[in-house]
Swiss-Prot record:
It comes from Parabacteroides distasonis (strain ATCC 8503 / DSM 20701 / CIP 104284 / JCM 5825 / NCTC 11152). Keywords: ATP-binding, Cytoplasm, Kinase, Magnesium, Metal-binding, Nucleotide-binding, Transferase. It catalyses: acetate + ATP = acetyl phosphate + ADP. The gene is ackA. Mg(2+) binds at residues 7, 385. It is found in: Cytoplasm. Its main location: cytoplasm. The lineage of its organism: Bacteria, Pseudomonadati, Bacteroidota, Bacteroidia, Bacteroidales. This is Acetate kinase.
Amino acid sequence: MKILVLNCGSSSIKYKLFDMTSGEVMAQGGIEKIGLPGAFLKLTDKDGKKVVIEREIPGHQEGIEFILSVLTDATYGCIKDYKEIDAVGHRVVHGGEEFASSVLINQDVINKVIECSDLAPLHNPANLKGVRAMEALIPGIPQVAVFDTAFHQTMPDYAYMYGLPYEMYKKYGVRRYGFHGTSHRYVSRRACEILGVPYEDQKIITAHVGNGGSITAIKNGKSVDTSMGLTPVEGLLMGTRCGDVDAGALSFIMDKEGMDGAGLSDLINKRSGVAGLSGISSDMREIEAAVAAGNPRAIMTLNVYNYRIKKYIGAYAAAMGGCDILVWTGGVGENQWATRRAVCENMEYMGMKIDVEKNEGMRGEEMVISTPDSKVTIIVVPTDEEFMIAADTLEILDKK
């Protein structure tokens, strides 16, 4: 069975085509700058080379039509006819409290995703554009929605409620939802497969750390807490997002700067985090280079960044009554060995010992990086959200 996975953003589409019989990735690529000058599709060809094709792409439907034409192209394609695609799996960012698992898309599901759109105004409408485009181009093709938030719907109320008037929750759904759920689910399961231990019996902390980042506590196979909240702003220090901050500080800044809600949103989403604190970049590689050169703000920023991750790991170990496995994933978690070392150092009190030699220089591969006598297994697992979406799509179709 061939399953196309789509991740539609406001001006982009990422895609992967899987042959689920073999688990092979048949094709992958993405479109950038939809509706803007200089739009292009980039793909990896059969020889592993990167190819860029420029073309005017006014909307998502034209973008997906372009993707289908490339998939069937004599030079770059891997299928003869797009009708060989059996189903489509879509990343949908926010399912609110409506969706605790992936679902086959119908009109009722679309309506509920629209209702959740005020919780993810930049993402859900774009995700639905992909759904509508596929229905227009291949009418009747089965489509499945896989939600970033669904995995975290097992959190207890004491973990997801904020200390605000209860009416804010009842009227507007103001609570912690969490994100990166598909990634946290994939890497936690994959870690247990690698280690040969039963998923349902473990206390796992997953650290998805990249330009965006979140930590999740998984007890007996269920998410019991996560660092992101109503929005992806809460929690860790991120590339341009502030992470945890005193809400009173925000009202103070608004008053001092004469700032409205839109200005505040821009501040905490786009002008804060690693970039705002360092004044250098949102890229941790550039921060590490500046640290090596002795830049004091870079040093402070890196310390804040690592400290925040360490603090959440400790908090979630306390919340679960211990930790059996710590999983690193995401762009930084998979590749920045110095961050992994800095966070895991001095955690021996909770049975966590990192193998400095194994960790150093290790990038982008599955590997245990804890010492043999570490009570907590520390493991790096590169995430594969697209495969998880394809697997969910296959499972739902098998149940039809």
